[in-house]
């Protein structure tokens, strides 16, 4: 049974490797010119010089994370952050006030609203009864 499972695992890895080597996305592993240029005529936008300046790779490039955005600020101060909801993503009418409404007291600040007094007596260990 173990040898059969091992053979299935090896066969499945072989099939996955075969599919990956023949797929279009496997061009990363190839180093010949055919992997970088499908034709030797023109680049993506019809500009061969642009394709050569970019290192010759035509196709999907992964986006790299940029961590230097904050260091490029000239004034070295905090960036201004708008307050309130974004009117583009939230349907707020233009005549609505731009500040949040103020409430007198939140309902959870009252002790009676946390748990009703009838249930507070039931919480805890059961009372000791004389059974003997």
UniProtKB/Swiss-Prot annotation:
Residues 68-132 are annotated as: Disordered. InterPro entries: CLV3/ESR. One of its GO terms (molecular function) is receptor serine/threonine kinase binding. Residues 1-26 form the signal peptide. One of its GO terms (biological process) is cell-cell signaling involved in cell fate commitment. This is CLAVATA3/ESR (CLE)-related protein 2-B. Glycans are attached at residue 85. Belongs to the CLV3/ESR signal peptide family. The keyword rRNA-binding does not apply. GO terms for cellular component: apoplast. The gene is ESR2B. Keywords: Developmental protein, Differentiation, Glycoprotein, Hydroxylation, Secreted, Signal. The modification Hydroxyproline is found at residues 82, 85.
